[in-house]
Structure formats: structure tokens, C-alpha cells
């Protein structure tokens, strides 16, 4: 079982650590507001993915992925939400003191349930790796907790990278707009995969 768990862990590290809509959004948050003000957003991202994993773990995900029309709607709603969330910082001129930023728990919690990349990685984790982890109870503990711990590390790191970039690039609005455009490009690319 240790080897099976290591396979899951490597998969999760690679999936969560690579650029995607959630990591780029949290990087924008870090660049705009710093790490500490985005803690709620990071916890929201982790909580949303935890819920998604539990839904898949109890079998509802397999049912939902068998509904192609629903998945198409999910993709477009997801893309629209992520573009909207990223674009909220387009004209923002405030730094970390900005009180009305959109990088809070309630915005973060719905990112992964609406994120097609999150659905694909969750489905793969449950179909390719979970069956080798023992009992359904063990699977329901290991898969969601592995994702949650890895997300806490990587989402915080992406947020910190955004904060560091903000310090290195004094033209904050230019940096923010560049990250927003990159996020939108990734979302549009993912939409047509």
C-alpha cells in the first residue's frame, strides 16, 4: 500500500503544483494583496477541492461525469467565473490594504468545483490510484487529505510567488494585468481541451 500511496502522492504533487486556473488566480491574489489577506481564498480553494473529492469518493462523481451536456455547461460556467474573478483586479490600484478584494473564502470555495482541470485530476485520482489504497474508508481518508495538504503547500507557494513578483516588479498594475491575461489564456485553452 505504501507504493500505491506514493504513486498517488506523486500524481497529486504534479497536478496541483503545475500552472492552472486556481494557481494563477491565487498568484494574482498574492500580487495584489499579499499572502496573509489571501489566506481565506487559499482555505476556500482547499475546502472546495475537499468537497469535490468527497463527492467523487462516495460515487456521485462517476454519475456526474457520465452527463456530457452537464459537463459542457460546467466548463462554460467555470470559464466565465474564473475570467470574472481574475478580471476583478483589472482596474484595481490599491495594494495589500485594499479592503474589497475578491480573494476571500467564499470566492475560493467554488473555484475547484467549477474547474474542469480539478474534475479531471479528481476523476483520475479516484479511478487510477484510489482502488489500490485499500478499503473504501481508507480511500476516502487518503485521497482528499493528500489533495488538501498538497494544496495548502502549493497554493500558498503560488500566492507567495505573486507577492514576491509584486515586490520585484514595481509597476503593480502591469504585473496584475499580465497575470490576469495569463489566467484568461489558460482558462480559454482549458475550455477547448
Regions from the language model: what does each represent?
Residues 53-58, 114-126, 183-193:
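Hydrophobic alpha-helical transmembrane segments in multi-pass integral membrane proteins
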Residues 2-69, 124-143:
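Juxtamembrane transmembrane-helix termini in multi-pass membrane transport proteins
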Residues 141-163:
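Hydrophobic alpha-helical transmembrane segments of multi-pass membrane transport proteins
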Residues 13, 17, 50-51, 87, ...:
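Hydrophobic/aromatic residues within the transmembrane alpha-helices of Major Facilitator Superfamily
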Residues 65-94, 151-154, 158, 168-193:
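Selective transmembrane alpha-helices of multi-pass membrane proteins
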Residues 87-111:
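Cytosolic-biased juxtamembrane loops and peripheral soluble domains of multi-pass membrane proteins
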Amino acid at each position: 500500500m505504501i507504493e500505491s500511496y506514493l504513486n498517488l502522492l506523486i500524481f497529486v504533487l504534479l497536478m496541483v503544483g503545475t500552472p492552472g486556473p486556481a494557481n494563477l488566480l491565487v498568484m494574482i491574489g498574492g500580487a495584489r494583496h499579499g499572502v496573509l489577506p489571501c489566506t481565506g481564498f487559499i482555505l476556500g480553494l482547499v475546502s472546495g477541492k475537499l468537497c469535490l473529492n468527497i463527492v467523487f469518493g462516495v460515487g456521485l462523481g462517476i454519475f456526474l461525469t457520465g452527463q456530457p451536456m452537464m459537463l459542457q455547461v460546467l466548463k462554460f460556467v467555470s470559464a466565465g467565473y474564473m475570467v470574472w474573478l481574475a478580471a476583478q483586479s483589472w482596474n484595481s490600484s490599491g495594494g495589500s490594504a485594499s479592503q474589497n478584494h475578491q480573494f476571500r473564502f467564499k470566492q475560493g470555495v467554488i473555484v475547484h468545483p467549477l474547474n474542469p482541470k480539478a474534475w479531471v485530476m479528481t476523476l483520475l485520482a479516484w479511478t487510477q490510484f484510489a482502488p489500490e489504497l485499500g478499503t473504501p474508508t481508507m480511500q476516502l481518508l487518503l485521497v482528499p487529505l493528500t489533495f488538501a495538504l498538497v494544496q495548502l503547500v502549493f497554493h500558498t507557494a503560488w500566492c507567495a510567488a505573486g507577492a514576491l513578483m509584486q515586490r520585484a516588479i514595481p509597476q503593480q498594475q502591469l504585473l496584475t494585468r499580465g497575470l490576469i491575461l495569463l489566467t484568461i489564456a489558460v482558462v480559454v485553452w482549458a475550455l477547448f481541451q
